[in-house]
Amino acid sequence: MVDYHAANQSYQYGPSSAGNGAGGGGSMGDYMAQEDDWDRDLLLDPAWEKQQRKTFTAWCNSHLRKAGTQIENIDEDFRDGLKLMLLLEVISGERLPKPERGKMRVHKINNVNKALDFIASKGVKLVSIGAEEIVDGNAKMTLGMIWTIILRFAIQDISVEETSAKEGLLLWCQRKTAPYKNVNVQNFHISWKDGLAFNALIHRHRPELIEYDKLRKDDPVTNLNNAFEVAEKYLDIPKMLDAEDIVNTARPDEKAIMTYVSSFYHAFSGAQKAETAANRICKVLAVNQENEHLMEDYEKLASDLLEWIRRTIPWLEDRVPQKTIQEMQQKLEDFRDYRRVHKPPKVQEKCQLEINFNTLQTKLRLSNRPAFMPSEGKMVSDINNGWQHLEQAEKGYEEWLLNEIRRLERLDHLAEKFRQKASIHEAWTDGKEAMLKHRDYETATLSDIKALIRKHEAFESDLAAHQDRVEQIAAIAQELNELDYYDSHNVNTRCQKICDQWDALGSLTHSRREALEKTEKQLEAIDQLHLEYAKRAAPFNNWMESAMEDLQDMFIVHTIEEIEGLISAHDQFKSTLPDADREREAILAIHKEAQRIAESNHIKLSGSNPYTTVTPQIINSKWEKVQQLVPKRDHALLEEQSKQQSNEHLRRQFASQANVVGPWIQTKMEEIGRISIEMNGTLEDQLSHLKQYERSIVDYKPNLDLLEQQHQLIQEALIFDNKHTNYTMEHIRVGWEQLLTTIARTINEVENQILTRDAKGISQEQMQEFRASFNHFDKDHGGALGPEEFKACLISLGYDVENDRQGEAEFNRIMSLVDPNHSGLVTFQAFIDFMSRETTDTDTADQVIASFKVLAGDKNFITAEELRRELPPDQAEYCIARMAPYQGPDAVPGALDYKSFSTALYGESDL
């Protein structure tokens, strides 16, 4: 028997249809093409014929009842062609030619031919089916004709993901029944025998009608009858199959099953459209949620970084001076710890923040979303401004620390100098008041008086010589006050005491002179030799005291030149020692001569010079002290010279490394700039090259670490300048940070270009052409085009943006797309986005609104219940939380405005 049932492989009925397939969804191929000769005399399989009669009759009646009629016997009731024409009018919605009402055979044949002609006009080639067979009641041909009508008007338009007809209907069934246990739809015969697939289809769309979990696979008749009864009662799908026939047939008739299943498809077609709309909305919402997650990450990272900057700047701007150098050195150590430990992670966070921001903006542009505008105060520019403020505060803080350390060092030096001079002066003034108050002249002889007068003159000479020391003490105290020395109170007290004592000495000296001069008239004797001794011994004694002060004086130098200057001065001082020694011997010779004269004249001396307290023993003692201090001074100067030579070595060592690292960083910066402009090869090649370049930069880090170690030694040695190099550690650090940031940003730009290329389908040749056009107008090779450069580029590409009103408006529109932040510059990434957008379709707000309208059943609003039914739970709640209440005249309680929500997704309104 000829198997015309194989025709279900395509939209035709005939023995050769199995080879045509369902791949031509829009094809009106030969529905009845022959594979072998059609044997009209062969009979249908009785079981299949029975199933087809029942199914096709029910299917026809489901449509004929709309016209108020039905058929009882499918091969008898269509013989006159009247109900056949009526059926075609109902299912097509079109008017057929007026039928002939005669009862003769010719009238019937003409009516059937009108029906067959109408079928053929729909692109269906009827093979081997003629009006005579239908009029004669040929069951095989009548069933074949009805199957052809079912294929054309009920199954042909079924399309699921580029498939159609049988394959589309089968794929639809597989998807709908996939979640159900014991259901595996692979065909339209035995996959449906247990009835579970029918129940699964109903439960998938109307779960309240079927208690699927209570169905048993081993009770197919119950399952089938349950599905048929529910479909007829609640879905208005007539019972087209008989449960016992399906169960008792080894292989149920495919056409009968497909006809019945197609009724389910059409009954649930609205739900199918809703599912498609829901999938589109889910896709759009998934993109939006991912972008919102990236925005939240950016906001948090930006907030944390800005908070750290906000907390750090006050610490760097705290310039409260400390009292001691130890406290300031601790502050300097804390600052170095901040530079080494706390700041580097924040530099990486800042770089990562810029990368995340650029990636987010690229994704937003690719998904046709508005550019991301961070919260107020959290723009990349705000972070850069805060970072710049931080680095300015950091630089000022370091300079302040070093200046404070220098100030405290000078204060310590001045304080020690003040104490030395004050101690020497106090030692000199000790007993002077008592001496000036002594009234020894009242009982002295004339010679004694003259001696007292000479002694007093010598004292006045000595007093005048000490005037410079007192002024130096006062000047040092004043400088300590001006430099805010922490122990200024004690210094001022001691200085005031010295000044008060000095004034008292001046007053007492004046009083004693008056007393001596008053008595002088009565006294004549004077020992000129002692007087000469006193006059020469006092200056010499002062010279030795000054020399001892200078030899014990502390010194602070920072360069070899300064220490060599001190050594030169010391050598010059040593060259004066022979003359000083001769002066000492001359003074001692005067003393010896006085003794010789006294002895020769039998003069009994008191043992001391009446005119001075400076004895030869004092002169010799101080001279010996000077002789001892000279080699000590030599040793101290040589030690300092060695220290400065070591410091010079550190300077040269640092300069040698810095003069290599600094130009290397500058060269790498220039090379990166050149690479970012030239960009030879594919984007993947460029990305690989840049990452290799980045690794070479990272591998260079040990050279920077070595320089940091050398810089640490310089700082520990308190070396504040270096004439051998123009590069400071701060310059090197800033250059290194800029180098890392630049290579990371360049890599990110290439990655974004790859992302844009893949998302938009841009070829490598197009990308290179875009780069060539961009570089041609990027005259300064800055990586961005100004408005005039960009306009010239657009004109070269054929855009009408001339300087007339219409061209200016078009140019302003394009600028708003490529420069949403109004920075006045168009980056290469923005240029690529614009060019790709001109040739690529993207989803729009109108598409999303249309999808929501499908879910809402063509209403202007949607309810939370409808959203929860059609969308996944998280995305349904996302929409409910953000949709505004619908305010239209047709609003119902709980109505939501999906139109404003959809436009807000694309930046056309506010959420």
From Swiss-Prot:
Residues 765-800, 806-841 form the EF-hand domain. Changing K255E: In FSGS1; no effect on protein abundance; no effect on homodimerization; loss of localization to the nucleus; prevents nuclear localization of the wild-type protein; decreased interaction with PPARG and RARA; loss of transcriptional coactivator activity; dominant negative effect on nuclear receptors-mediated transcription; increased actin-binding affinity. GO terms for biological process: actin cytoskeleton organization; muscle cell development; negative regulation of substrate adhesion-dependent cell spreading; peroxisome proliferator activated receptor signaling pathway; positive regulation of cell migration; positive regulation of non-canonical NF-kappaB signal transduction; positive regulation of sodium:proton antiporter activity; positive regulation of transcription by RNA polymerase II. Widely expressed. The modification Phosphothreonine is found at T249. GO terms for cellular component: actin cytoskeleton; cell junction; cell projection; cortical actin cytoskeleton; cytoplasm; extracellular exosome; extracellular region; extracellular space. The modification Phosphotyrosine is found at Y31. Spectrin repeats lie at residues 293-403, 413-518, 528-639, 649-752. The keyword Transport applies. Its main location: nucleus. Residues 177-192 are annotated as: Polyphosphoinositide (PIP2)-binding. InterPro entries: Actinin_actin-bd_CS, CH_dom, CH_dom_sf, EF-hand-dom_pair, EF-hand_Ca_insen, EF_Hand_1_Ca_BS, EF_hand_dom, Spectrin/alpha-actinin. Belongs to the alpha-actinin family. This is Alpha-actinin-4.
